[in-house]
Amino acid sequence: MKRNSILFIFILLLCIGLQYETIYYTDGSMSAAEYGLMGVSIFLALFYMIPALYFLFCIGKKWELPKNALILSLLGGMFLSGWLSSFANTYIHDLLGILFPDSAFLNAFESAIVAPLVEEPLKLLPLVFVLALIPVRKLKSLFLLGIASGLGFQMIEDIGYIRTDLPEGFDFTISRILERIISGIASHWTFSGLAVVGVYLLYRAYKGQKVGKKQGLIFLALALGTHFLFNSPFVELETELPLAIPLVTAIALYGFYQAYRFVEKNDGLMN
């Protein structure tokens, strides 16, 4: 009975997300030109989405992770974490605007501070449902489920940005999706992979198993810190040779690689 209740709640939240994420395209408010531009932009985004999904499921098969768990985690990132984060970010933005009106600091750093603290926990929320329905016993499986949720979130966020960019015209919309495709090399999928390993290791430490506590703190700090930097004015620094974004990207990828090495070495930690 408990498992059925969890499944129903999960399906309900996914259905809400599906309606929320698609209503703009089905309510008749878009013009023919906007539909065309939307189609072109999504087609471009598929050049990273399809390979990313292919490698995700190939690794899942290699690591013997149940395919249904991977699919549910991916859908959860798209249609559960996405709309919950959107609502949470909006409400927090409105609240901060009331508490600290005309704050130059918040204007510059609100997204950098709020987004990691809101989105990283919510991207892990689908895993709570997935693990309750399909328990896994390997740290690599947990790591990959986190990556899947982050990738799903990243994909739906990119589509959402296409939608909001449409009024700015063809040139702006295309340039923005190309920018997001390039930056996708180290985006939400890396943050979530780092975060899930960090949170699990800290949970183990809370339960009295101290092995990996230091690494857990480092991985979680990397997830939040790199997300902060990507949303901060730091990445807008202009130098003769591009440095800001490559530096943050390198930090994220290096941290992710270290998390992967830890997971490979300690795969049986969940047993």
Residue ranges of predicted features:
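Hydrophobic alpha-helical segments at protein termini of multi-pass membrane proteins
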Residues: 1-271
